[in-house]
UniProtKB/Swiss-Prot annotation:
Full protein name: UPF0473 protein SAG2089
Pfam families in the record: DUF1292
PANTHER family on file: UPF0473 PROTEIN CBO2561/CLC_2432, UPF0473 PROTEIN CBO2561_CLC_2432
Family label: Belongs to the UPF0473 family.
InterPro entries from the UniProt entry: UPF0473
């Protein structure tokens, strides 16, 4: 999912940072761009992430990763799961919420 990042950069963003560990044990920092409560419709929550310190490409876009997540009871860790590519209803909901988020920025 690419994001055309056209909004005012003269304000500070206070994003939480999380660490993702891949299957090889490599750690990568990501900023939490947006969380979405999808429990009522899909029974899970979603998170949109951008690599920490990511820069826009030539087209002014930044790659955004979307996951469903289940938070541990203590709120410090949780499990991220890829969203199935064929789950059109989930992707439509995420895109709708994300576009509303961009409109508010």
């Amino acid at each position: 999912m690419a994001h055309n990042h056209n909004h005012d950069h003269n304000h500070e963003h206070q994003h939480e940072v999380i660490t993702l560990v891949d299957e090889n044990g490599n750690e990568t920092l990501f900023e939490i761009l947006l969380t979405i409560d999808g429990r009522e419709e899909f029974g899970k929550n979603y998170v949109l992430l951008v690599p920490a310190g990511a820069e826009e490409d030539e087209q002014g876009e930044i790659e955004i990763q979307a996951y469903s997540f289940t938070e541990n009871a203590d709120g410090t860790e949780g499990d991220l799961q890829p969203i199935p590519e064929d789950s059109d209803a989930e992707w439509d909901m995420i895109e709708e919420v994300f576009n509303s988020f961009l409109d508010e920025e």
